[in-house]
Amino acid sequence: MGKFPKDFLWGGATAANQCEGAYKEGGRGLSSVDVVPFGPDRFPVALGQLKMLDCDAEHFYPSHEAIDMYHHFKEDIKLFAEMGFRCYRLSIAWTRILPNGDDAQPNEEGLRFYEELFDECHKYGIEPLVTLCHFDTPIALIKKYGGWKDRRMVDAYAHYCEVLFQRFRGKVKYWLTFNEINMLLHMPFMGAGLLFAPGENVQQVKYQAAHHELVASAKAVKLAHAIMPDAMVGCMLAAGQFYPRTCAPADVQAAAEADRDNYFFIDVQSRGEYPVWAKKRIERAGIALQMEPGDEQLLKEGTVDFISFSYYSSRCTTVDPELMNKASGNAIMDAVKNPYLKASDWGWAIDPVGLRITMNSLYDRYQKPLFIVENGLGAVDKVEADGSIHDTYRIDYLRAHIEQMEKAINEDGLPLLGYTTWGPIDLVSASTGEMKKRYGFIYVDKDNEGKGTLARSRKDSFYWYKKVIASDGEDLA
C-alpha cells in the first residue's frame, strides 16, 4: 500500500442527535429528531407522512438518551485520541444554542458545552469538523413556520451560524452547512422539518424548501469567510454512484439521470447556480420557485470550498418497474439488487470500488478538494464471554475502502483532505433508530429498547484503526 499524505485527516464522525442524548438538559429545546420514534411509525414520521411534533408516552424515542455523550464526551474523546484521531466530525445541536431556533440571545450553557468539547479535542491535537445542521430542525420553527418551506428559516439559520462563527473562531476551521442535504427530497421531515397538508403540491414544497436551504448555505459560507478568513466550508452529499442494471441504453440513461438528480444540491453549492437540466425539470413539473432579488448573486458568491460526502454503497437502477424496490442497498432511495455485489445485514451493497468511482465522478464534476466524512459498516456485534468483540467483518469492509481511497489519491491524483468513518463509537441509527446496527470501533452497552449500562469497550477494529492511522494508511493488515 502507498502512504497517505502526512497532513491527511484521519478520524471518525458522529451527529449530536444520535449520540449526545440529554435532550432536555442544559437549556436545550426540542428538535425534529427528538419526535421521530423507534418502531413502525419511524419512517412515516421521517417522511413527513405522519404528523408528530411532540413526544408522547406511547412511543420510545432513541435520541433522548442516545449514548449519553453529553455526559461522557471527555471519556469518548480520550478513546478517539488513543486511536490517534487527527479529526473528529461532530454536529452542533441547533436547539442547544437557540432553544426556539431563532432566540435573540443564545443559550450560554449550550455554547459552553461545545467550547469544552472543542478544547478537549485540541488537548489531544484533534481537529474538529463541525456540521451546522444535521437532521435537527428546531420544533419551535416547524410549528411557527412549517420548517424550511418558509423563507424566514434562512434568516434564523444565518443568525444561528453567526453566533457559532463568532464564538468558535480560532477553535474550528472546518465547517459543513447541511448534512446530506439531498436527503431533503427523500426524508423531508428529517431533512427539513416538512409536513404536507392534504392536497398540497409535495414537489413544490420540497423544491421551495431546497431553495431556502441552498440560499442559507450560501449565506453561511459568506458569513464564515467574513468572520474567519482561514475557515474552510464544505457541502455534504449522501453519495454513491448509480450503475445501470444492464447495458441497454434506457438503463444507462436512467443511471445517468439518477446520478444527476443526486448531484442537484451540490451542483448549486459548488458552481453557484442552478444547472440547466434542473431548471427544465422544475419548469416541466409546474413548480413555481419563489426567488427573492439577489438570490442568484448570493448563490454565486457563496460557493463551498470543498466537497464532503457520505459513502456506504453504490446503487443500481433500471427502467424495468418490476425489478425496482426499496430494500436493496438503501431503504430511502429506489434501487435494484446488484447481482455482482454482496450486501450488509441491512441490505446495503458492499462496493469499495464504487467509492473510487464516486470520488472520480465528484472531482471530475467540481474540481474541488474532497473529504469523505462518513463511511462504515452497520452490523450486529457479538460480545464474547471475556468482553472481547471480534469484528473482522468491519475491518475487512474498511480496509477494502481505504485501499480504493489510496488508489484514488496516488493513481488518479485526487485531492482528498481526510476520512472520518461513520460511528467511531456505537450510536443510534438515523434510518432505523436501532442500537443493534453498530458501526463503532468502541462498543456501547445499550440495546434497541434503551437498556444497558452505557459502558464503553474497545472492539478489535479499535486496535486495527489505531495501527492504520499510525502508519499513515500503509499498514492495513
What is each PLM-predicted segment?
Residues 1-57, 81, 100-102, 111-477:
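Active-site region of glycoside hydrolase catalytic domains
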Residues 92-106:
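Glycine-rich, proline-tolerant flexible connector loops at the mouths of alpha/beta enzymes
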Residues 68, 72-93, 301-306:
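Catalytic domains of carbohydrate-active enzymes, especially glycoside hydrolases
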Residues 58-72, 149-152:
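Active-site mouth loops of central-metabolism enzymes
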Residues 63, 70, 101-104, 345:
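Short, flexible active-site loop motifs that bind/organize anionic cofactors or intermediates
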Residues 86, 95-97, 135-137:
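A short acidic, glycine/proline-enriched capping/turn motif at secondary-structure boundaries
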